[in-house]
Design a protein with these regions (language model features):
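Solvent-exposed loop/linker segments at secondary-structure transitions
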Residues: 170-285
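Acidic, metal/ion-coordinating pockets
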Residues: 1-189, 195, 222-232, 242
Length: 285
């Protein structure tokens, strides 16, 4: 990411997938700041993450306020609960009430909500806070550049497969012109960074990832892959029932030789297992 020339990033739910120590290391390695207004706590670099950051570009002062989604129950982002133990999260929409004062600062030309909430969350921000000029979003992996009554929204897909070129004219703190362009980074006509390609290939060329560990005679759907995955766990752990969240299974088992890279594609998180005794009457599905 340092090689992409980022100026700033928001913390998203998957930043926590490998634990707080790893995330703290990644933040310290980054040559750009992370922001997130609706969480607190943590150690190391996590304790230093700012709520917002002001960046000056070509004479324009831009305030970036960060926010991450807090899951279906509003308690923590969609990651393993153990990975966010000791951290405290607040409502990512309501937290923007605390930052209205930023728009009153005459030195700020543009207020940007840099979010990992998904499309519906970004829409709520523009519906509720007219001081936000632009929402740069993520999480739901959409691709769009839209104008709403109170501001603008953009999102650029996932995994850096695409970027958004957004061109705006600003006059007296107001966006007077907005143009949005999608740039597909898989386009073969784009110039490639050869040194970066070599670095990526270095990680991909680990022989242990491609060692044969099995064979599948058919292609599996996601549901079938889930059945295979949970049945394998049941056999190894020797239990009666295995419960696995569907979002934790990220790929399908395909026909052919099975290698560790296939398994990591199916289960990239390495969340571990909890084994416990429960009665049928206590099990509520």
């Amino acid at each position: 990411l340092n090689r992409t020339g980022l100026d700033i990033s928001v913390i998203g739910n998957h930043e926590f997938d490998y634990g707080q120590n790893v995330l703290s290391d990644r933040i310290s390695q980054a040559n750009f700041p992370f922001v997130c207004a609706n969480f607190s706590g943590g150690k190391g670099e996590l304790s230093n993450v700012k709520k917002f950051e002001v960046i000056n570009k070509d004479g324009i002062s831009i305030a970036f306020i960060g926010a991450v989604e807090t899951g279906n129950f509003g308690r923590y982002p969609l990651t393993h609960p153990k990975k966010v133990k000791g951290l405290f999260f607040t409502n990512p929409i309501k937290i923007f009430e605390d930052y209205k004062i930023i728009s009153e600062n005459s030195d700020i030309d543009l207020v940007v909500a840099l979010t990992h909430l998904g499309k519906s969350g970004d829409e709520k921000l523009l519906q509720n806070f007219n001081y936000i000029d632009l929402v740069i979003g993520g999480h739901s992996n959409h691709v769009y550049g839209k104008k709403y009554e109170n501001g603008y929204m953009i999102m650029s897909g996932k995994n850096l497969e695409m970027i958004s070129k957004t061109t705006m004219s600003i006059y007296k703190g107001e966006i007077t012109d907005f143009r949005f362009e999608k740039i597909d980074l898989s386009n073969e006509s784009l110039e490639k960074d050869h040194n970066l390609e070599l670095l990526i290939q270095k990680y991909k060329d680990n022989p242990s990832l491609y060692k044969r560990i099995g064979y599948s005679s058919v292609n599996h759907t996601k549901a079938e892959t889930g059945c295979f995955y949970t049945e394998a766990i049941r056999e190894v752990v020797n239990v009666d029932i295995v419960i696995q969240n569907s979002g934790g299974i990220r790929g399908n088992l395909k026909k052919g030789v099975i290698t560790p890279i296939n398994i990591y594609t199916i289960d990239p998180f390495g969340n571990g297992l909890d084994k416990f005794l429960i009665t049928p009457s206590e099990l509520n599905l």
